[in-house]
From Swiss-Prot:
Domain Guanylate kinase-like as annotated: residue spans: 5-184
Positions bound to ATP: G12, P13, S14, G15, V16, G17, K18, G19
Enzyme Commission number: 2.7.4.8
Any GO MF annotation of the entry: ATP binding
Source organism per UniProt: Bacillus subtilis (strain 168)
Lineage: Bacteria, Bacillati, Bacillota, Bacilli, Bacillales
Function as written in the Swiss-Prot or TrEMBL entry: Essential for recycling GMP and indirectly, cGMP.
Designated gene of the protein: gmk
Protein name per Swiss-Prot or TrEMBL: Guanylate kinase
Amino acid sequence: MKERGLLIVLSGPSGVGKGTVRQAIFSQEDTKFEYSISVTTRSPREGEVNGVDYFFKTRDEFEQMIADNKLLEWAEYVGNYYGTPVDYVEQTLQDGKDVFLEIEVQGALQVRNAFPEGLFIFLAPPSLSELKNRIVTRGTETDALIENRMKAAKAEIEMMDAYDYVVENDNVETACDKIKAIVLAEHLKRERVAPRYKKMLEVE
């Protein structure tokens, strides 16, 4: 029987660099994760591509997906919906492949309830002032929205106790290395490895 894949969930406050870290991880040739693309109702940022960075939907389309139980998790964050398509995630895990989710904190907590065996990593900013600077530098939010995001960020940072690991994103390359090391260690845990060896001993 094929070993079930590992669900890797990366989340953290807006502006912490989740997308940048995810892109850096998937640009490396030795990356073996499958990326689960999220669905959102927010407008695309400059350079974002539909079906690559997100599936961009209208609110009506998103709410229909909720009604049809097509989302593993979903949340409304600063006026926009975000969610994860459930079918792709479950099938990929059954195929023995690791699935990488980059989602908002609210969504991650929902996934934790559905997949307690998953690996949950909180990406943290070096400081709140640096986090605000990153959001401002994006140039995509109004002053009011920036303040809303900062309030949300403070609340989200307080939720990091719900995660297995915390990685500070002070340097993208270093953060990527830490995340990949965490995933490797998780695959080598006794709970995942021992059953395979015990079965091998039974055969011999």
